[in-house]
A protein has these predicted regions:
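Phosphate- and other anionic-substrate recognition elements at nucleic-acid/protein interfaces
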Residues: 1-126
Length: 126
């Protein structure tokens, strides 16, 4: 199982991908243009996921991420976790946000995958 933190904006998403040990495998920004984002997730599926393996994604709730939530299912996303946006601070960056989201997901993976609640997180079945 892989753990994907996504910080989403209108023109790009910033991604932090962790493995089962919590190590960051990939941190990058991807355009939200359909060709670019589909290219990225095709490559992720092809190069990072073994047969039958899937990933779990976490992203902040926003008014324009419904298309992304639906699209993740096409690329073997097992579950999507939504979180309320974190308070803004001076050292907030897209990369830090994506890394913090993937870490939050990885730290709570046992409870989340067992379907148990985690305060502040809402699971979405896709």
């Amino acid at each position: 199982m892989l753990y994907l933190g996504i910080d989403q904006h209108a023109r790009q998403i910033t991604i932090s991908l962790r493995d089962e040990n919590g190590d960051v495998l990939m941190a990058r920004q991807v355009s939200t243009r359909p060709t670019k984002i589909n290219e990225y997730f095709q490559k992720l599926t092809r190069e990072r996921l073994r047969n039958g393996e899937s990933f779990v994604a976490v992203l902040e709730v926003c008014g324009f991420n419904d298309w992304l939530i639906r699209m993740l299912k096409d690329y073997r996303c097992h579950k999507v976790i939504l979180i309320q946006p974190v308070e803004r601070n001076r050292q907030k960056t897209d990369r830090r946000d994506a890394a913090a989201l993937s870490e939050l997901l990885w730290v709570n993976r046992g409870r989340l995958l067992a379907g148990k609640p985690v305060r502040g997180l809402r699971q979405v079945d896709i």
